Amino acid sequence: MDAEIEVKKEEKTKRKSNIELLRIICIIMIIAHHYTIHGGLGQYYTLGINKKVAFVQILSIWGKMGCNIFMIITGYFMIKSKAKPKKLILLLLEMIFYSLGIYAIFCIFHLATFSKDALMKSIFPMFFQNWFLVDYIIIYCLIPYFNEMLQKLDKTTFKKFLGVLFIIGFCIPTLINKTIVNFNELGVLIVMYFVGAYIRLHTEEKSDKKYFWLMIAFDVALVGLVLLWDFIGVKFQEVTYIKEATRFAQINSAVVFGGAVYTFLFFKNNINFSSKVINFLSSSTLGVYLIHDNPYIRGWVWNKISPGKAYMSSNMILVHAVAKILIIFIICTIIDKIRIFVFEKPIDKLMDKNKR
């Protein structure tokens, strides 16, 4: 997720911004997902569904795709790079900084109760918080072994390997809404790492209009399936369909898989530009994730500060959602830039100095 962790700088003169823009879009997709999930808006998924509820459903379906794209990006860059202990240490320090810092602030202002258990969870967030970051750390530690294995596979064998994983881990769960093996989030993210590695090793980097249309096709299919399930639920007065309308947006959905792959291919091959602003903002996507999805911030920002539920009876729900998502992204980015300037850069320089 973090540009400093995932990207090996390939252009010493002018770094391209296509993938960096994609990172920003992905974190916004994840914030939008949390707007619905953590904002408690799922309670409105009833037979009384209307356009506003359908909008909220559609807003929620992009988060897992964003996670999958982040891991494709990691696989794409890291398959030809080495996992460095320094980068892992900086990641762990960032996690602890936000986890412990936010907990301390909440205790100081009496927004949380101090306890030894909560303190330990804040000191060791890699074991208790942020499933995505925990899985990311595990995968990062396994990168040397993954790369050694994947680089030995020829293109045909690699493609067959991915095909088997796709059928078992994505197609079957999507069709029957049930996993046949214990293919959890970690397993899915590992497959997405493999996909990114395959794209880097065995595909050409050339612009192709089909990537755009395939990206649109999977996105439209995802939205269409949500609306279809809503329609079936209303038609046959079965609320279960409405409550499960977002099942096709799960992290192991074949539709989400396709959308993630072709979104990445579209941005990688069809978009080519350089922007210092985009590159500057994208390096804080991890910080944005850690701040806004912190367990203390989560309940506070979604349910205490201008909650989305207060706008479900208003025509302003669309404006409110967009505004709140963007404000969260901007504020979290500013906070992370301060952290980088005050803490991370000095630590980074100190580590480099001691290394010499």
Protein language model regions, located:
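Solvent-exposed interhelical
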Residues: 83-86, 141-165, 199-217
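Alpha-helical transmembrane segments of multi-pass integral membrane proteins
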Residues: 104, 231-343
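Interfacial loop-to-helix transition and helix-capping segments at the boundaries
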Residues: 54-67, 120-135, 174-192, 227-260, ...
